[in-house]
Swiss-Prot record:
It comes from Mus musculus. The modification N6-acetyllysine is found at residue 486. A motif ('HIGH' region) lies at residues 45-53. The lineage of its organism: Eukaryota, Metazoa, Chordata, Craniata, Vertebrata. Keywords: Acetylation, Aminoacyl-tRNA synthetase, ATP-binding, Ligase, Mitochondrion, Nucleotide-binding, Protein biosynthesis, RNA-binding, Transit peptide. Residues 1-41 form a transit peptide. This is Nondiscriminating glutamyl-tRNA synthetase EARS2, mitochondrial. A motif ('KMSKS' region) lies at residues 284-288.
Length: 523
């Protein structure tokens, strides 16, 4: 333990104000209305970013951008034993992938850094010293074994476990005696009865008399690392956070945080607690559900725009729910006062439809389409590799034609490399015996189709082909139009089902259609 802190533990506390004490009414008003909006997303890198975290980050981001403010990423990495390798980097990667990058962060830096709590220990020590000096905090020498016994006894009696404040009123002599044995005690904060009420921007006027239901909380552990309660207050103050938008699970802790603000003489920010994001059946999103992590969605072809759309569509904060909103539209339409206290129920079965809408919008965009072409090229190479007999299928113009023809029919780019679309990239091995028609009819139909392809001045659009293909069965005994289309679909794709034959032909182009028909005839 640092020498100044040890001296404070041995000194008689002086109950003095560290600044002006924040009154009950002041605590509800928060920062100066003219102050710049600064919000933060403060995840713990003990895991990777999931949909619940994305929603909290998104609400902070769009609130900041709507008010020309700053969005800050702060990593709460004080629980060193639970850190997951790579999680810190992945969290920031996923925010950038989602299109909501922070203005200040561990990676980007900024005027209020550092942005990892493990690098801000001196600030927490300073705040702890101030609280010890004023008598608002005290050392706790209770062993983990004793605390565990308290917990077990409470549970046995069907009571909520709480610390019994045993070390709260130790004399100076007792503190000195215990410091000789345990020079690194934990530091606890004295909970007071008079908790300031505060006006939550979602839940309204709120007050929790925490001292009546909780023991004094640890704010600084014996290893010098703070707990969440101290760290978030100190960081929000020093980072000039104007509004705290966080999950509703922290609502009951806010009174505790206001007591800390009051003891330190600091002005608290405004608070807005967001209702939980739940599964469609009302159950909690579980981190054990592997498919709720953003990396899963990114790897399986879902667009960030679709995720942002669905997690706002199922909740509140907007005048109406509608599918297909873009991020600029979310920023424009967002209204914090419209967030209700009701949990948001997320139906992930609808995500493919959301993705379909946003993929269609991107395909229709002249500026966005080249990026989709590049991604599709990578998917085709990965899926088919050496099976690609014709490298022309990787040509950007061909890829673009496929995207434009299939827009609205596919939910993800990955759909285009599924077995049903394999004919776009590889030539099927089809024998004429598989076509389900007499050999004579096959020859006639093939000859007519090849003649159609050679007809001068004929523009082979889908509309023209749909009209001309109806004529292929004319005069053929027992040959219906539907059976002819089935034959051609098999010849071109090796499949019984798929897109309309006219679209297949436009997709493949006259040269490839001719080669496939001739290949079947010669088999």
């Amino acid at each position: 333990m640092a020498a100044p802190l040890k001296r404070l533990l041995l000194a008689e506390p002086h109950v003095v104000a560290l600044g002006h004490r924040v009154g009950r009414r002041e605590a509800s008003l928060g920062p100066d209305p003219g102050a710049p909006v600064r919000v933060r997303f403060a995840p713990s890198p003990t895991g990777f970013l999931h949909l619940g975290g994305l929603r909290t980050a998104l609400y902070n981001y769009i609130f900041a951008k709507k008010h020309q403010g700053s969005f800050i990423l702060r990593l709460e990495d004080t629980d060193q034993s639970r850190l997951v390798p790579g999680a810190a980097e992945s969290i920031e990667d996923m925010l950038e992938w989602a299109g909501i990058p922070p203005d200040e962060s561990p990676r980007r830096g900024g005027p209020a850094g550092p942005y990892c709590q493990s690098q801000r220990l001196a600030l927490y020590a300073q705040a702890t010293e101030a609280l010890l000096r004023s008598g608002a905090a005290y050392p706790c020498f209770c062993l983990p074994q004793r605390l565990e016994l308290l917990k077990k006894e409470a549970l046995r009696s069907r009571q909520t476990p709480r610390y019994d404040n045993r070390c709260r009123n130790l004399s100076q002599a007792q503190v000195a005696q215990k410091l000789a044995v345990d020079p690194k005690p934990a530091i606890r904060f004295r909970l007071e009865e008079a908790v300031p009420a505060f006006q939550d921007l979602v839940y309204g006027w709120t007050q929790h008399e925490v001292a009546s239901v909780e023991g004094d909380p640890v704010i600084l552990k014996s290893d010098g690392f703070p707990t969440y309660h101290l760290a978030c207050v100190v960081d929000d103050h020093h980072m000039s956070i104007s509004h705290v938008l966080r999950g509703s699970e922290w609502l009951v802790s806010t009174s505790k945080h206001l007591l800390l603000y009051q003891a330190l003489g600091w002005q608290p920010p405004r608070f807005a607690h967001l209702p939980l994001l739940l599964n469609r059946d009302g159950s909690k999103l579980s981190k054990r559900q592997g498919d709720i992590f953003l990396e899963h969605f990114a790897a399986t072809g879902f667009l960030p725009e679709a995720l942002l759309d669905i997690i706002t569509n199922c909740g509140s904060g907007f005048a109406e729910n509608q599918m297909g909103r873009t991020l600029p539209e979310l920023i424009t339409q967002f209204d914090l006062t419209r967030i209700t206290c009701h949990s948001a129920l997320l139906d992930l079965e609808k995500l493919p439809e959301f993705n379909r809408l946003h993929l269609r919008r991107l395909v229709s965009s002249e500026t966005q389409r080249p990026q989709l072409v590049e991604k599709l090229q990578g998917l085709v190479k990965e899926a088919f590799g050496s099976e690609l007999q014709n490298k022309d299928v990787l040509d950007p113009a061909y890829m673009e034609r496929i995207l434009l023809l299939r827009q609205g029919h596919i939910s993800r780019l990955q759909d285009l490399v599924s077995p049903v679309y394999s004919y776009l990239w590889t030539r099927p091995a089809v024998h004429r015996s598989e076509l389900g028609a007499s050999s004579e009819n096959v020859d006639v139909i093939a000859k007519r189709l090849l003649g159609l392809l050679e007809r001068p001045g004929l523009s082979l659009t889908q509309d023209v082909l749909n009209r001309e293909l109806k004529k292929l069965s004319e005069g053929l005994e027992g040959a219906k139009h539907s059976s002819v289309m089935k034959l051609l679909r098999m010849a071109l794709s090796g499949q019984l089902q798929g897109p309309p034959v006219a679209e297949m032909m436009v997709s493949l182009g006259p040269k490839e259609v001719r080669e496939r028909i001739q290949k079947v005839l010669s088999s």
